[in-house]
């Protein structure tokens, strides 16, 4: 699941008319970076929650997102908070609303963060899925531009 429902307040005025996951970095929308990273690890099913200007995201990505010749297309489904509730539900509410559409084991990642070096690997997912753990938090170092976090 990729979280993509937030208002993007710190990015205003850019997010006044564009949802933050569609802002481009290096010629690609922010949401495309985790989609490509997941596709590179063999994941072909992704649920995206939407909120602020949420209709823009399925309009841009559709239900099948092709990555060119590199990987198979990613099948996309959407949890449309803005459509059903009139607003985004915050992180926990968005996850709770999406649970019926998710598998018993799933990854949750931000869909509006530039992360070109996506740190997860399919082997990590498979190891977690085989474990008795209920959740796993993946900690990553603070980026050089924000060393205090």
Stretches found by the model and what they are:
Residues 61, 116-149:
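Conserved core of the sugar-phosphate nucleotidyltransferase
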Residues 13-14, 68, 99, 125-128, ...:
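Short secondary-structure boundary/capping segments
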